[in-house]
Amino acid sequence: MGFQRRAAVITGGSGGIGAAITARLKHDGFQTVVLDVTEPEATVDAFVRVDLSDLDAARSAAAEIANRFAVTCLVNNVGVVMPAPLEAVRAEDMDRLMNINLRPSIVCAQAFLPGMKAAGGGRIVMNTSRVTLGKELRTLYSATKGAAQSMARTWALELGPHGITVNCVAPGPIGTDAFWRNNPPDAPRTQEIVNHIPVRRIGTGEDVANAVSFFCAPEAGFVTGQTLFVCGGVTVG
């Protein structure tokens, strides 16, 4: 039968970039299911409140959704940053970021793969980051996002025969609430950031959601194992 838009699960889909992704996939015709610790900003078909860093809770939530919905799309979006210079990186912080930024991707994929295979296809998208190319104060964050990109390429090879594609979107500077708190619009530092972006603007959650929408479309079935940088040209400028 091949891939069809049925239910899409978005981890960390309640706010920021995740909310934009959730809204776009809803617009595209998916049922949308959000796994997060806070209520979603967007209209969704189901919301499960869960701390995805808790392994047992994550497994339980994913199993619940797999039983309730025909999941053919998974967007692994949940993540935290925790910037720090190398000298200040702590082992416990490494565990925390791996448990939030990476492990839920595996837990959720394992829960939804049987349904995707039975349906004849699926879409998995990782929300990574341009920091995989290098950025100061991002030792742990870049490690987890780089691992996600490598994992996506491995999964693309394993799952391709089942009609399941696996790709990454890697945002650059995106105007989330956290970004604007740290970089007020009228601050000189913010203008410096804009001046270093070839398209001369800060990205939006919708820019990232557009890229996710492409990877989750039936027409994207011949694209897998790829990373699309949504960065306004920063990675090449």
Could you say what each language-model-derived stretch is?
Residues A109, T144, A152:
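Active-site helix of classical SDR
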